[in-house]
């Protein structure tokens, strides 16, 4: 038996005592039983040959450099009978990991997440097995301690390689066994919808006598870049293994104009105020979104035009988060200034004024505008620091932008100041800024990393006022959240519609750390920006998932590469990556690492797919508003918007307000930020 060894600061294949990853003989599963055989090792050729009944399994290891090995597995049926089986490739850590990761799926056990979601390593005594299409690096698992990291993942160079699954098993001695299965399996259950587990899913390979099966995989060993950040090493290599080059389907100008078109379509008259409404969506959306409908009833309603008609049926108006009322309005204002459209500029300013007028003396306000008028309004919720953070940031940014064009609106600056003053006074050493608050100033939900959004609001307010208390409070908060969460490669609670580990909560920490680096010049903040960005991109798809001709992804030409998974509760892709483009480009500017540019371009190219344009407006038989885009892209056996999870590769019909706002924010930043304006990707 040989292994990946570490000696003299180099990784090699060998048989010594400095093992990091032990390379195991092949196994197959046949008729529900796992079988292995006699293995012959040839270190000179880098081969392990295992005989299992009539099968010969030959693994050839090729050194790809810096701890990365490509493995080519060839299975030949040398017998006289046809065999149906599942192939198992496995390695074992030679160290006891302190943490583990299945990207997009399981972040060290998903502590604090809901019971009917994948948590821990097992369920009902069996190891979780997840299909490749749930993970941003195919069938990837990673284990680490402070000294070493171990990862394996499938290649995307053939269908047989890619159609795979993965699992992790903790052994009695504290080591881990990491597995890749071919073909696809999900067990002991399929996580098929929001907090719903259904029956397992199994595929098998059949080989006739004389036939072969070939699949490629990778084994990776590293010394973690930072403690708990072996994923950073892995992601740097993944950027080379999987080409992230993509050609955007729209030009930046087209994306901007379509974003403005949709923001205008979202303008809504409500109780004498102009607001940005939450979305265009079908009436069926409410019951789908909360998974509050049976598959049978959903099937019935999907045939009823009353339920499937797309419209503005939900009177919800949120300051930040999912509706991005203020950000959309600021983008409308920027466009109106550029075009000389005074009427639209006044409308955009009016939206800000309506929100500012609701602020209490203590600085707080409801974060959903309709709650001032409808006590039992749809999606009623306590005010939260995600919205407060966006509110302070956008009021400060709008104040600055208007002032640069000769328009004084001190009310907007004062709004940000009062809101930030409240949280300077109510910051807690135990929970930071918390999550949800009453209007009276009581923290009713202290959990999560969501306070990063408020730290961003603090720094934008500091930029306007130069009051050092906002800078100091942001630094104090970041120290807290990094020490508790980010330094452990975890973020939670930013996605307000789930109880989950998620991606979007990392976004403000990238930006906040970059601002602090620019303000102080201290290296710790650049390292923190990198950490948050690596965590964010651990949710990114590095490859294109495979679909049949009947899939909507195939019909609409959607590619998963560059997309970012939502959370450990919501196993789908969204276009949130567009918001992180500018900070990723800033990281490239400050570090000189071009991989951040590649990542930014990939996220952008993914995020502009499926936008309704004059040439492409009809989806699911309905004409969508110009510039709209569905909120979710459902790449695996998980959905809330179909009666069965087997309809992999489909769009939903919730045409959200936030996605266009983030794209416009990024395009606006490209225009005004000299550091990144020449780094943006034009359509070829």
Predicted regions and their residues:
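Active-site lining segments of carbohydrate-active enzymes
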Residues: 373-380, 396-468, 483, 518, ...
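Well-ordered alpha-helical scaffold segments within catalytic/enzyme domains
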Residues: 326-342, 390-408, 453-467, 508-522, ...
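Extended, well-ordered alpha-helical scaffold segments
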Residues: 230-269, 340-358, 404-426, 466-483, ...
């Amino acid at each position: 038996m040989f292994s990946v060894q570490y000696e003299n600061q180099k990784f090699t294949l060998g048989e010594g005592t400095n093992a990091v990853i032990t390379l195991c003989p092949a196994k197959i599963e046949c008729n529900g039983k796992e079988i292995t055989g006699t293995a012959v090792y040839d270190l000179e050729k880098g081969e392990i040959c295992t005989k299992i009944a009539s099968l010969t399994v030959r693994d050839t290891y090729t050194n790809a450099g810096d701890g990365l090995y490509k493995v080519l597995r060839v299975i030949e049926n040398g017998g006289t009978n046809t065999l149906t089986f599942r192939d198992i490739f496995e390695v074992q850590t030679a160290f006891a990991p302190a943490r583990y990761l299945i990207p997009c799926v399981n972040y060290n056990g998903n502590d604090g997440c809901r019971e009917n979601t994948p948590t821990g390593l097992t369920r009902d005594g069996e190891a979780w097995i997840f299909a490749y299409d749930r993970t941003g690096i195919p069938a990837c698992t990673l284990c680490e301690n402070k000294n070493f990291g171990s990862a394996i993942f499938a290649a995307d160079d053939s269908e047989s390689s890619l159609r795979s699954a993965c699992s992790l098993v903790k052994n009695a001695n504290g080591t881990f066994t990491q597995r890749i299965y071919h073909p696809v399996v999900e067990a002991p259950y399929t996580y098929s919808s929001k907090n719903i587990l259904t029956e397992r899913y199994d595929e098998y390979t059949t080989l006739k006598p004389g036939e072969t099966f070939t699949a490629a995989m990778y084994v990776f060993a590293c010394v973690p870049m930072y403690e708990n950040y072996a994923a950073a090493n892995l992601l740097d290599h993944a950027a080379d293994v999987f080409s992230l080059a993509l050609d955007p389907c729209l030009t930046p100008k087209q994306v901007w104009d379509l974003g403005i078109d949709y923001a205008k379509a979202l303008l809504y008259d409500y109780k004498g105020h102009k607001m940005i409404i939450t979305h265009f969506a079908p009436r069926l959306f409410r019951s789908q979104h909360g998974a509050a409908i049976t598959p049978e009833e959903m099937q019935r309603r999907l045939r009823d035009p009353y339920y499937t008609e797309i419209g503005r049926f939900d009177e919800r108006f949120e300051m930040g988060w999912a509706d991005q009322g203020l950000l959309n309005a600021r983008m409308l204002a920027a466009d109106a200034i550029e075009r000389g459209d005074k009427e639209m500029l006044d409308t955009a300013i009016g939206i800000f004024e309506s929100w500012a007028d609701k602020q209490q003396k203590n600085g707080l306000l409801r974060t959903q505008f309709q709650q001032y008028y409808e006590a039992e309004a749809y999606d009623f919720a306590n005010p939260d620091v995600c919205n407060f953070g966006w509110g302070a940031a956008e009021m400060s940014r709008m104040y600055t932008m208007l002032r640069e064009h000769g328009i004084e609106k001190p009310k907007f600056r004062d709004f940000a100041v009062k809101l930030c003053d409240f949280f300077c006074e109510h910051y807690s050493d135990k929970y930071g800024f918390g999550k949800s608050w009453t209007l009276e100033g009581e923290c009713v939900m202290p959990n999560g990393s969501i306070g990063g959004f408020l730290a961003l609001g603090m720094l934008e307010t500091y930029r306007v006022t130069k009051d050092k208390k906002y800078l100091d409070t942001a630094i104090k908060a970041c120290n807290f959240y990094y020490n508790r969460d980010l330094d452990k490669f975890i973020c939670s609670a930013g996605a307000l519609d789930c109880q989950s580990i998620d991606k979007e909560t990392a976004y403000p920490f990238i930006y906040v750390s970059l601002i602090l680096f620019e303000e102080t010049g201290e290296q710790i903040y650049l390292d923190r920006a990198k950490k948050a960005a690596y965590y964010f991109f651990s949710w990114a798809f590095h490859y294109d998932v495979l679909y049949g001709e009947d899939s909507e992804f195939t019909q609409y030409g959607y590619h998963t590469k560059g997309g970012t998974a939502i959370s450990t509760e919501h196993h789908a892709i969204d276009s949130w990556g567009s918001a992180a483009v500018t900070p990723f480009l800033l990281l490239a500017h400050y570090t000189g690492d071009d991989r951040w540019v590649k990542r930014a371009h990939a996220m952008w190219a993914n995020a502009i797919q499926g936008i309704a344009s004059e040439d492409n407006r009809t989806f699911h038989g309905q004409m969508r508003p110009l510039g709209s885009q569905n909120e979710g892209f459902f790449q695996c056996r998980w959905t809330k918007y179909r009666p069965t999870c087997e309809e992999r590769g489909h769009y939903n019909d919730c045409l959200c307000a936030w996605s266009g706002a983030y794209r416009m924010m990024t395009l606006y930043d490209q225009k005004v930020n000299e550091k990144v304006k020449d780094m943006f990707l034009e359509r070829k």
